[in-house]
Amino acid sequence: MESKKPLILVSNDDGVMAKGISELVKFLRPLGEIVVMAPDSPRSGSGSALTVTHPVHYQLVKREVGLTVYKCTGTPTDCIKLALGSVLDRKPDLIVGGINHGDNSAINVHYSGTMGVVIEGCLKGIPSIGFSLCNHRPDADFEPSGPYIRKIAAMILEKGLPPLTCLNVNFPDTPNLKGVKVCEQAKGCWVNEWVTCPRLDDHNYFWLTGSFTDHELENENNDHWALENGYVAITPTTVDMTAYGFIDELNGYCQQLEF
């Protein structure tokens, strides 16, 4: 009996109609059967948010040989939970988020709905990868990333990933990629994050904006440096946020507390 093709579950935070997810599906189709469960509209910046105040529902968008596409009224994480719990008839071999319009390097990983997809897959014990491009334009050119996406996804299908570990892969916006660089997450922060917009009724409103400040400009081992220098940044990311290096010291402090 012929073995089943690998099942790859795909989602994003830019919405089911975004070019990035369409291109991702195109790149992944040679590797297996693709099921898309993506938000019905953009959900950028939603992180691992869940919908808990009202029901969500999903709808079939397209079905053809090797590809099924659904849209969902929930968040990216809702999409993965719903697909795994109520839609798919078998466990995916791989979960892929993206391709995000805009990078998810450095601290952006904490805010990203695309990485929320990946983190949820990781928590479910499924190898998971997030792909992002440093270009926010709706018509961004994803073509240079295609061969890298196929090879990285095929590698993880074959090799797997350690428990509670996923991959955060970011592409610089250039047709001349220099290759891949395995990186650590850059340390930095966003500054000047809000623009105040006055209104005639004296009630100001605010647009989220800002710029990223890298605190380690000379660190050639972080993802921000790799992207600035034309490399595909691959960052192994863990969902275990325990500060193991501080446990013993904190335990010492706590032993001195009196209750």
Swiss-Prot record:
Belongs to the SurE nucleotidase family. Its EC number is 3.1.3.5. It comes from the Bacteria. Nucleotidase that shows phosphatase activity on nucleoside 5'-monophosphates. It is an enzyme of class 3 (hydrolase). One of its GO terms (cellular component) is cytoplasm. This is 5'-nucleotidase SurE. The gene is surE. Its cofactor is a divalent metal cation. It catalyses: a ribonucleoside 5'-phosphate + H2O = a ribonucleoside + phosphate. A divalent metal cation binds at residues 13-14, 44, 100. It is found in: Cytoplasm. Binds 1 divalent metal cation per subunit. InterPro entries: SurE, SurE-like_Pase/nucleotidase, SurE-like_sf. Keywords: Cytoplasm, Hydrolase, Metal-binding, Nucleotide-binding. One of its GO terms (molecular function) is exopolyphosphatase activity.
